[in-house]
């Protein structure tokens, strides 16, 4: 039941095969069984059951609100939720309870969806592993798959021993893990440079970054205003399209959203691939790209070609500058956005009896981790009067060149670009933390951040399993506001590769092992 698509579970609810309360209880049980993944910061059990009960009354009267009525969903903990603590996984916002819902959260609630809780992330969404938040790292559910335990984990020789667990990707790792572990049917993430697509690829789920301006950012605690986009994580492409249709559209509370009416996003059941042109950017054969991922990428291109599509190599000539450009622009906006956390209006405030300036400094020292403080420092350096033209202005000009590269390719007749999402499959946590956050992020964002700078839509789809039995995702990039075409192509690919979902039983067994380990540690 928990592995059904949105349309399937909606039909089951309508036919009375399961009630909204029963479905909510099953998801709550899954959350408890998979607590060891650390996917959630806050579980809103009481509120979820109340919302499910209200949904059940609507179904009994035949007045359900639509396909999402009674459907459990989760939200990354950098979206405001009325009456529910919103922390950004930071000491700075521990205890902060917003008085309003983010627009995307409210839209789902208005459709009768049931909020299960707030998911874990890197502090203030600054990271690519979901390892740097104050609530601890998120574990990738695939760490506990039989394929990985049998092939890839050096610590898995004994059945009663935990494997060397993998990172979930970031910064929306909690949302990706929550969907992959069947604790909800949909999760919201955020995507500034790949923070939805990266963890989706590592956790074997679909991750959609919409066109900038298609979905409201109101209530999303900002990282980089000019690049932030709410992301959607689901277990299949059509589910992502259903959610996007609900979320898309103008919001008077967000001046950057489109004014035009959004076209319906229903995906056709079949598509003539022979009419498409698929572009393969030659610059994306990047240093560090694993041989396996390269092979899956080539195989996917061959799949389109054998179906009649025109597959051509294209050039995005300014790609090599994109990571450095992204770093300058990202940290500059971070420095500006983080200035609001000063200990006065909301969030953490140091309790020392000191001057106002000393209070500011102490509050930020106590509230932010080293990663956040480091990015603030870098951003302020780039914004100094003597550096502004050489760094910030120059980076803005390069950003325009990067966006123009995409415009040129799409105007030449290319419909969709096909690229890797990540350099490789997920890595073990102990290996991941050997490198600092900045280095890791630069590596992990290499295929994803240029899309944010260009404001384009992109979706990652699980493509294959590596030799270690882990998911490898491929990314499709489309023209601005052409999500229907993008998702139609992605759906066709998804149906062709038929990627298998994670086995529910594997996670249940892993939960029992984790519980035994926890018990033995507490006893000793």
Curated annotation (Swiss-Prot):
Pfam families: Amidase. It is found in: Mitochondrion. The active site is at 76 (charge relay system), 171 (charge relay system), 195 (acyl-ester intermediate). Residues 146-168 are annotated as: Disordered. GO terms for molecular function: ATP binding; glutaminyl-tRNA synthase (glutamine-hydrolyzing) activity. It catalyses: L-glutamyl-tRNA(Gln) + L-glutamine + ATP + H2O = L-glutaminyl-tRNA(Gln) + L-glutamate + ADP + phosphate + H(+). Its EC number is 6.3.5.7. It comes from the Eukaryota. Subunit of the heterotrimeric GatCAB amidotransferase (AdT) complex, composed of A (QRSL1), B (GATB) and C (GATC) subunits. Belongs to the amidase family. GatA subfamily. This is Glutamyl-tRNA(Gln) amidotransferase subunit A, mitochondrial. It comes from Ornithorhynchus anatinus (Duckbill platypus).
């Amino acid at each position: 039941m928990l592995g059904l698509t949105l349309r399937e579970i909606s039909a089951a609810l309508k036919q009375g095969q399961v009630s909204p309360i029963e479905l909510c209880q099953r998801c709550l049980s899954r959350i408890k069984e998979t607590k060891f993944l650390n996917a959630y910061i806050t579980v809103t059990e009481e509120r979820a059951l109340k919302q499910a009960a209200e949904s059940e009354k609507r179904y009994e009267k035949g007045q359900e609100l639509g396909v999402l009525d009674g459907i459990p969903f989760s939200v990354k903990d950098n979206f405001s939720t009325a009456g529910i603590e919103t922390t950004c996984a930071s000491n700075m916002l521990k205890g902060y309870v917003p008085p309003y819902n983010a627009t995307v959260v409210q839209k789902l609630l208005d459709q009768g969806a049931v909020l299960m809780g707030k998911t874990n992330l890197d502090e203030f969404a600054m990271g690519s592993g979901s390892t740097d938040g104050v609530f601890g790292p998120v574990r990738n559910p695939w760490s506990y798959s039989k394929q990985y335990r049998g092939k890839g984990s050096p610590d898995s020789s004994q059945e009663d021993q935990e494997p060397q667990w993998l990172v979930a990707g970031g910064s929306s790792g909690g949302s990706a893990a929550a969907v992959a572990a069947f604790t909800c049917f949909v999760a919201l993430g955020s995507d500034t440079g790949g923070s939805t697509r990266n963890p989706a690829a590592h956790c074997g789920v679909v991750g959609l970054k919409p066109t900038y301006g298609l979905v409201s950012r109101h209530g999303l605690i900002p990282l980089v205003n000019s690049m932030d986009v709410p992301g959607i994580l689901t277990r299949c492409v059509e589910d992502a399209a259903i959610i996007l249709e609900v979320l898309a559209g103008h919001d008077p509370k967000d001046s950057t959203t489109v004014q035009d009416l959004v076209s319906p996003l229903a995906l056709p059941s079949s598509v003539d691939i022979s009419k498409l042109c698929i572009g393969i950017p030659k610059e994306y054969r990047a240093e560090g790209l694993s041989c396996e991922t390269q092979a899956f990428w080539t195989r996917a291109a061959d799949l389109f070609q054998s179906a009649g599509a025109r597959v051509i190599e294209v050039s995005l000539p300014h790609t090599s500058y994109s990571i450095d450009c992204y770093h300058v622009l990202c940290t500059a906006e971070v420095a500006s956005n983080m200035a609001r956390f000063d200990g006065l209006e909301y969030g953490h405030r140091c309790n020392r009896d000191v001057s106002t300036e000393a209070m500011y400094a102490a509050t930020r020292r106590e509230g932010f981790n080293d990663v956040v403080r480091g990015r603030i420092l870098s951003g302020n350096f780039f914004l100094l009067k003597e550096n502004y033209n050489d760094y910030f202005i120059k980076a803005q000009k390069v950003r325009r060149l990067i966006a123009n590269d995409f415009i040129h390719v799409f105007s030449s007749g290319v419909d969709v670009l096909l690229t890797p999402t990540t350099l490789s499959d997920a890595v073990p946590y102990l290996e991941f933390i050997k490198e600092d956050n900045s280095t890791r992020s630069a590596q992990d964002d290499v295929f994803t951040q240029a899309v944010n700078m260009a404001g384009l839509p992109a979706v990652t789809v699980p493509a294959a399993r590596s030799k270690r039995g882990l998911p490898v995702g491929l990314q499709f990039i489309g023209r601005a506001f052409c999500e229907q075409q993008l998702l139609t192509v992605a759906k066709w690919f998804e149906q062709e590769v038929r990627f298998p979902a994670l086995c529910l039983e594997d996670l249940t067994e892993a939960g029992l092992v984790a519980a035994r380990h926890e018990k033995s540690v507490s006893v000793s």
